Amino acid sequence: MRRVVEWTQLPGEGPRVLMLPGLGARGAGFQALARRLQHVARPLLVEYPEGPHAARGAGALAQEVFEACGPVDAVVASSFGGMVAAHLAAAGAARGVAFLGSFTRTEHLGPRGRLIAMMGPIAVLGRPGPLTAALASWRPIAPSRVPEVVPTTRLERMTTLHRAFAIRGEPPPPSLRGLPVSCVCIQGNRDVLVPPATVKRLVASLPPGTPQYLLRGAGHVPYFTHPEECARLLEPWLAALAPPVTLGSSSPRPMLQRV
């Protein structure tokens, strides 16, 4: 059982880039994308804590991630990971966020956002497996790789249950629209969990001019199924990532506390 955030930094050059998985996925699913970014970045792969003690919403989880990894240059976030990334960016712990099939508030999901807590019972009672992984990915997944996409063990499913219930129990992250944060949105046109219509609502909460990309044939986990395409879109964004901004006293931003 992982009682704390576990992370691995891959060798590379350039900005320090944190890879954040979704609600029930494993950080290991980012490996293919991370390898393709190593010539322009230093990727960090993260695994969230497990067990009843891990019933933390996105804000509390962002605090745990910050305590483990410290500040980063950018975050590449999938699904629920976008909420965690938004907390980090709003607190000044990340200068850029790439949203891959992601959101920062449940309202971005439309009516289905009110049912986000149901992802927990679905994970426990539905017992996700190859079929669920294929639906999320929009393509067949090798049995050995299914655990990278959906929760397959009882511990993972129960952790997903606890965390899904915790999401609505805390305030959502602040809007990033008025902050000096560089963002980019990548969305699969076959995403059945976070539909493409979500992007319009998400972009409205991000800095003006945030670029949007739609990947044809990609489902909910484009970083897993389309790592080359994602890397091609992320490379120029990482290269253009603005240098750190020194904020005056008129624009305070609360920092997460690292212990």
Where are the regions that the model predicts?
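Short alpha-helix in the alpha/beta-hydrolase fold that links the catalytic acid
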Residues: 32, 181, 195-204
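Conserved alpha/beta-hydrolase catalytic His-Asp/Glu region
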Residues: 126-177
